[in-house]
Curated annotation (Swiss-Prot):
Subcellular location: Plastid, Chloroplast
Family assignment from sequence similarity: Belongs to the intron maturase 2 family. MatK subfamily.
Domain of life (superkingdom): Eukaryota
Identification of the protein by name: Maturase K
Organism in which the protein naturally occurs: Lilium henryi (Henry's lily)
Length: 512
């Protein structure tokens, strides 16, 4: 544990001491309002009650003047919390609005130390900037290349929710600005008290809805602390000193294990040669779920689970259930990750070998990475969104029946195209056809409900124009490059995988 503590101290960047005065600067609130400057595509705009959602410098200046008053921020948080459900007065509107402004501005400020650290580390490692690396689909080619050669996989659920004070202590290691940390405690205390007014198990939900930027920042800070353990143990257990990005920057330096009397000299290998093609451990995470895969034995994976559970208990001071980490063999197990069911298929092949006059057959096995669309969770998501029943029977969408015909078709078509675009990497697309069928028929039933007609009469009147809205761009491109095969028809091939490098978030229907 002492070695672990030294590792944590060594890896810390210089702490920031003067963040709190930035709350008195107007440009901070301009940055917080303009999400496009920060690439905040994940954050939906918040609609303030009783106010137009437009940015106003007058309100910002008024807020800054009031913040110069003594204990204004304390009263702001407390009054906003007490009056949220106490009536719709102008006093409540103004305090709630100011509280939201300060909260969003504070979110921008606390990101500054981490942004500087990220930029400096990328410049030191000379990591090339590429927009394609921002796509979450870029994870799947890595899994496709590595997963078929591994033996065991551990499906990890990162522990949540945790106490808010633990989040403050995590930031305290990076930020030593005491007023900023106290202000963060006030905001977290506000949502905790608001939780008591609504329900006892909705704290994280309310917090993430009202201030997504701050919520995801705290969440990523917490997950970053969890991943420090993985990097530490990986450096302690490997021959090569590797980095968290997986690149062997010091590939010419080797270390021998003296207990086995094995000393590997760097002179025996060329610097461009990779003596170990694959690391022992592969780690992939998205949001609160992670995958730890290894070529090692089942006992090795149990040791890693033991390390994780004990680390969470020691460092974060809370009990972590071992059942959050499932260890299974990749050949007999499929796990749900990022909207796909991932697994490894065993494909037997018979190879004919002929030597002079003798010929014989050699049976061989090839492991293949398999991606399946989970049809049951998708139908459940469509059912929650009122597109079908729990059994998958399409129904109309009454809430959209008052829209124009073009808007109704466009909304259904956009959902269908997004789902098809995201699941283009599936090796079996039969399930995707059922989802398309549900959305098409739900669209037709919605239009028939609006015009007080039947689906048959509506389709006869509209013709094939209704179906063209559900024809995805991938199908058009593939039909151009592969004219001899109908890839996306029911009688064609269904196993072509396409990983799109422009997807930066999971569709809400997929993520349910």
């Amino acid at each position: 544990m002492e070695e672990l503590q030294e590792y944590f101290k060594k890896d810390r960047s210089p702490q920031q001491h003067f963040l709190y005065p930035l709350l008195l600067q107007e440009y901070i609130y301009t940055l917080a309002h303009d999400d496009s400057l920060n690439g905040s595509i994940f954050y939906e705009p918040i609609e303030f009650i009783g106010y137009d959602n437009k940015f106003s410098l007058v309100l910002v200046k008024r807020l800054i003047i009031r913040m110069y008053q003594q204990n204004f921020l304390i009263y702001l948080v407390n009054d906003s919390n007490q009056n949220r459900f106490g009536g719709h007065s102008n006093y409540f509107y103004s305090h709630f609005f100011y509280s939201q402004m300060v909260s969003k501005g504070f979110s921008v400020i606390v990101e500054i130390p981490f942004s500087l650290r990220l930029v400096s580390s990328s410049e030191e490692k000379e990591i090339p900037k590429s927009q394609n690396l921002g796509s979450i689909h870029s994870i799947f080619p890595f899994l496709e290349d590595k997963l078929s050669h591994l033996n065991n996989v551990s499906d990890i659920l990162i522990p949540h929710p945790i106490h808010f004070e633990i989040l403050v202590q995590i930031l305290q290691c990076w930020i030593q600005d005491v007023p900023s940390l106290h202000l963060l405690r006030f905001f977290l205390h506000k949502y905790q008290n608001l939780n008591k007014t609504i329900q006892s198990n909705k704290t994280i939900y309310v917090f993430s809805k009202e201030n997504k930027r701050l919520f995801w920042f705290l969440h990523n800070s917490y997950v970053s602390e969890c991943e420090f353990l993985l990097v530490f143990f990986h450096k302690q257990s490997c021959y090569l000193r590797s980095t968290s990005s997986g690149a062997f920057l010091e590939r010419s330096h080797f270390y021998g294990k003296m207990e086995h009397i094995i000393i590997v000299c760097c002179n025996n290998f060329q610097k461009t040669l990779w003596p170990v093609k694959d690391p022992l451990i592969h780690y992939v995470r998205y949001q609160g779920k992670a995958i730890l895969a290894s070529r090692g034995t089942h006992l090795l994976m149990k040791k890693w689970r033991y390390y994780f559970v004990n680390f969470w208990q020691y460092y974060f001071h809370f009990w972590s259930q071992p059942y959050r980490m499932h260890i299974n063999s990749l050949l007999n197990y499929s796990f749900y990750f990022m909207g796909y069911l991932l697994g490894v298929l065993i494909n037997p092949y018979a190879v004919k070998n002929q030597m002079l006059e003798n010929s014989f057959l050699i049976d061989t096995v090839i492991n293949k990475f398999d991606t399946i669309i989970p049809i049951i969770p998708l139908i459940g998501s469509l059912s929650k969104a009122k597109f079908c029943t729990f059994s998958g029977h399409p129904i109309s969408k009454p809430i959209w029946a008052d829209l124009l015909d073009f808007d109704i078709i466009d909304r259904f078509g956009r959902i269908c195209r997004n789902l098809s675009h995201y699941h283009s990497g599936s090796s079996k697309k039969q399930s995707l056809y059922r989802i398309k069928y549900i959305l098409r028929l739900s669209c037709a039933r919605t239009l028939a409900r609006k015009h007080k007609s039947t689906v048959r009469a509506l389709l006869q009147r509209l013709g094939s124009g209704l179906l063209e809205e559900f024809f995805t761009e991938e199908e058009q491109v593939l039909s151009f490059f592969f004219p001899k095969t109908t890839l996306f028809t029911l009688h064609g091939s269904h196993r072509e995988r396409i990983w799109s490098l422009d997807i930066i978030r999971i569709n809400d229907l997929v993520n349910n």
